[in-house]
Amino acid sequence: MKPPAACTGDALDVVAPCSAVNHLRWDLSAQQIAELTTELIEQTKRVYDCVGAQEPQDVSYENTLKALADVEVSYTVQRNILDFPQHVSPSKDIRTASTEADKKLSEFDVEMSMRQDVYQRIVWLQEKVQKDSLRPEASRYLERLIKLGRRNGLHLPEETQEKIKSIKKKLSLLCIDFNKNLNEDTTFLPFTREELGGLPEDFLNSLEKTEDEKLKVTLKYPHYFPLLKKCHVPETRRKVEEAFNCRCKEENCAILRELVRLRAQKSRLLGFSTHADYVLEMNMAKTSQVVATFLDELAQKLKPLGEQERAVILELKRAECEQRGLAFDGRINAWDMRYYMNQVEETRYRVDQNLLKEYFPMQVVTRGLLGIYQELLGLSFQLEEGAAVWHEDVALYAVRDAASGKLIGKFYLDLYPREGKYGHAACFGLQPGCLRKDGSRQIAIAAMVANFTKPTPDAPSLLQHDEVETYFHEFGHVMHQLCSQAEFAMFSGTHVERDFVEAPSQMLENWVWEAEPLLRMSQHYRTGSSIPQELLDKLIKSRQANTGLFNLRQIVLAKVDQALHTQTAADPAKEYARLCQEILGVPATPGTNMPATFGHLAGGYDAQYYGYLWSEVYSADMFHTRFKQEGVLSGKVGMDYRSCILRPGGSEDASVMLKLFLGRDPKQDAFLLSKGLQVEGCEPPAC
């Protein structure tokens, strides 16, 4: 396929000189965090006061739009220094101080977003300035500020504005508390070795012990997922699954009810019928009806596949109960799902996950992953020895453009769990790559935070294949942050439409299902041998194992999210239980409240969880149309991808970027085929 002409340009901003400074620091005490928070608020407010005091005739690009853009750059960096430690600091005092800083700064963010005087100056500027006199991205920035002002109700009566401001402040604090509760949860369950039957020795040996010599199983991912997949004792799985979905049940249940109520109230004040419609106005989908149709149609297509998969699982369960002398209850329980889905992979596809992970030691995976990304995107990574970091496990890398040697950014890797740390895997943008006040380009800096199994004195960290996939995905977000060359902080990195933001990373997950990349990031941890070809072939074929059930569960989560944000009276636990039964065909465990543990609902994905599936339409199309056709390790396609999809950040609409990269409008064919569904006139290898 001939590459789109628009993708052939330079992937770097060659005009602006680059400032190589890392402005981040991680040595602040709790007291310093508190003091600097107050200082940052005062400094930033002074700029807003200055903009808000301009007379109509004096308003200009320099004293209004550029002043706001410049303060956004410095404020974003300083804010991240103060509020990021709540997720990663080994010190509880620092985490607490950082959380308090986040609360104060979130309240301040609301105050600044509701500055009617500043909004009026932006409106005056728009009326005054000739649109073609602004650079395209500056014009987009101006339009975005006007749009955000209206979405904050700054065109409405003052009384309404005050109500909206009050609600926004409450929402910020509730979201922080919701996720803090989950991060700080230290629940563990004690079990005997017999109760943990089926789990490998390296897992059992890594567990801490209680005073009576029982093994401590926490509810963090490195314990929860392996246990649900491998433990053959149903009662143990039941206890752990139930505890996992009861985390922070009382406190987060109350927070979630209040979040939903306040979001609906705010959206009505702004003239939207539901919170979902308010949120989706800024996304590719635009309305809740479009999302509902997308999810309903996909569910209908996947349900027959889900029924077939449930029948297979039920038969596996019946046979195992007979073999182990256990009573067969004739149904699939929530705590059975991951266990038997894993068995499907091991029996139907003959993929032995315990054997497979021996080929994925962390150091080898990291070396291979970094090598692939460097080759694919024309980059060069270098470890910075002795860098200032927040914990000894953390590493910092410098990233350069391979062709020019120009520094474009840095990234931190924080890959292992510890108490009080953020419990999932995520990329945090810490220093936006954009233009500074003096016109120089600020390098982008991001952190990948994960919770992979930590090495012990006896064994290295060995990754499950799905953890390798997670690693690839989150590192894709890091690359999006670093390769973006936007002028404004507001459009830097992953600041794209929320239902597109996952697409660049999802597309890069495909590399962990292709033979050549897999061989490059694997090696047996003892013998150094490559994955046997037979095991590799089985792994690749297993990609569509359980695809019906897995994606139906994603639809359940997306529909719960939509229901809560379109029907304010919906009870979260009841709605989740209803959808589990109706769509997945597997009941939720009685007494649990999964939505109270669903961090996305309070983490910026409200009414937007559907975006994971929606984004996959584009990620599948990009991969199959370009990389699969022209070479999965093609540096040429990789550079087109970097130029068309990563370079713009949010300075272009996603639909424009996609059309440039694909050479046409996106299609659903590759997405549907990737789910194991038939597409008329389309064969899987060709689409």
Curated annotation (Swiss-Prot):
One GO MF term attached to the UniProt entry: metalloendopeptidase activity
Residues given in the record as Zn(2+) binding sites: 473, 477, 480
Residues found modified as N6-acetyllysine: 538
Active site positions, chain numbering: 474
Superkingdom of this protein's organism: Eukaryota
Stretches of the chain forming a coiled coil according to its record: none
One Pfam family this sequence matches: Peptidase_M3
Alphabetical list of PROSITE patterns matching this protein: ZINC_PROTEASE
Enzyme class: hydrolase
Cofactor note: Binds 1 zinc ion per subunit.
Cellular component aspect of the GO annotation: mitochondrial intermembrane space
Cofactors, names only: Zn(2+)
Keyword Transmembrane helix applies: no
Catalyzed chemical reaction(s): Preferential cleavage of bonds with hydrophobic residues at P1, P2 and P3' and a small residue at P1' in substrates of 5 to 15 residues
Subcellular location(s) of the protein: Cytoplasm
Positions of modified residues (Phosphoserine): 172
The family this protein is said to belong to: Belongs to the peptidase M3 family.
Subunit structure: Monomer.
Entry protein name: Thimet oligopeptidase
Source organism of the structure: Bos taurus (Bovine)
